[in-house]
């Protein structure tokens, strides 16, 4: 992974953490820049707008949800075992979000 992509990934990770605390609507280039100890223009250069930053955060949130909840459940046999795994994974994720915050609340 190139340095620019590593930086962008780190920004998205920090922005996701921030968004779980303040909500996606409160997420701004300035707030993320402060957390990352970067200039606003440095963060802006990776996304081009506040909206693109927010979209990247939502995509990352959904990607992590799929990795932690959906894909592991799909390894289970069809039917009730898969449904039980999906529910168990979802509840595990939800209880972790109680401590860290949920992106949408």
Predicted regions: what they are:
Residues 7, 28, 57, 69, ...:
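Hydrophobic alpha-helical segments typical of transmembrane helices
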Residues 29, 50, 54, 83, ...:
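A general structural signal for well-ordered alpha-helical segments in protein cores
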Residues 34, 48-49, 59:
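Residue-level detection of the helix-turn-helix DNA-binding "recognition helix"
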